[in-house]
């Protein structure tokens, strides 16, 4: 399975990082407290949009050939996108840790670090890179979720906790997670079904911030998800395909938010 392969590779990568810079050194570099900016933009009136910076994926291969993270961030800065998700996973998504630093220089939007967090080391690293939030995936962490969630909060990060089914949702709720991301993509098969959000949202308490991820292709999809009670959507591939046309992406966002 692709997910198992990603996790195996990620664990090796983190061990190499620890060898170069031990976790104790990393912890000493942490500065700044909790801004809460990521959670704030998801909770504002109307549906919020998280625009993703993503060059590739295991299911689609290269999505954006002439990839420039700074150029993409500048587009997101100009249109009514509320937060930016930055893919930092190198091997399978062609991401890079430095993209967060680069984006931070040109954008005022809160940044979500999108990666496969398998070690506490990556949480400290995310804070130092300048992320406002991290993604924690229940199918990757299992019973480690609570500890990783609490550590993330303690260093001043918001946490988007990703689930795909009812069992994973229960684990997230038991850990006290306040931002739940429903991934419409099954990470085991990479099949996508936007109805996953509709099927799971009814089991999520009302005081939880809900994000729908994957398979969101049109403004109509976003308005449909908003009607279900979703607070925010995360859009990657759809935006990457039109990112060079600022008018097109601006119109898409306006229409999705009901102003088009």
Curated annotation (Swiss-Prot):
Question: GO:BP terms for this protein?
Answer: L-tryptophan biosynthetic process
Report the pathway entry.
Amino-acid biosynthesis; L-tryptophan biosynthesis; L-tryptophan from chorismate: step 4/5
Q: Which Pfam families match?
A: IGPS
EC number(s): the record gives 4.1.1.48
Q: List the disulfide bonds.
A: none
User: Which HAMAP family does this entry report, sorted A to Z?
Assistant: IGPS_B (MF_00134_B)
Name of the protein this chain belongs to: Indole-3-glycerol phosphate synthase
Q: Which gene encodes it?
A: trpC
């Amino acid at each position: 399975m692709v997910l198992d392969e990603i996790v195996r590779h990620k664990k090796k990568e983190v061990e190499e990082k620890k060898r170069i810079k031990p976790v104790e050194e990393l912890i000493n570099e942490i500065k700044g407290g909790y801004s809460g900016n990521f959670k704030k933009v998801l909770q504002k009136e109307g549906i919020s949009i998280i625009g993703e910076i993503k060059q590739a994926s295991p299911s689609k291969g290269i999505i954006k050939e002439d990839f420039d993270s700074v150029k993409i961030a500048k587009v997101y800065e100009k249109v009514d996108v509320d937060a930016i998700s930055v893919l930092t996973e190198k091997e399978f998504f062609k991401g890079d840790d430095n993209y967060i630093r680069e984006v931070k220089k040109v954008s005022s939007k809160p940044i979500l670090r999108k990666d496969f967090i398998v070690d506490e080391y990556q949480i400290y690293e995310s804070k130092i890179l300048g992320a406002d939030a991290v993604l924690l995936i229940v199918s990757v962490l299992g019973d480690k979720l609570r500890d990783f969630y609490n550590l993330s909060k303690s260093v001043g990060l918001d946490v988007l906790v990703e689930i795909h089914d009812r069992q994973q949702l229960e684990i997230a709720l038991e850990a006290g997670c306040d931002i739940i991301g429903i991934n419409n993509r099954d990470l085991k098969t990479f099949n996508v079904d936007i109805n996953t959000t509709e099927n799971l949202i009814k089991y999520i308490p009302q005081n939880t911030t809900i994000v729908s991820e994957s398979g969101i292709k049109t403004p109509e999809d976003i308005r449909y998800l908003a009607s279900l009670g979703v607070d925010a959507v995360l859009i990657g591939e759809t935006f990457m395909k039109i990112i060079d046309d600022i008018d097109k992406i601006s119109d898409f966002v306006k229409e999705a938010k009901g102003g088009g």
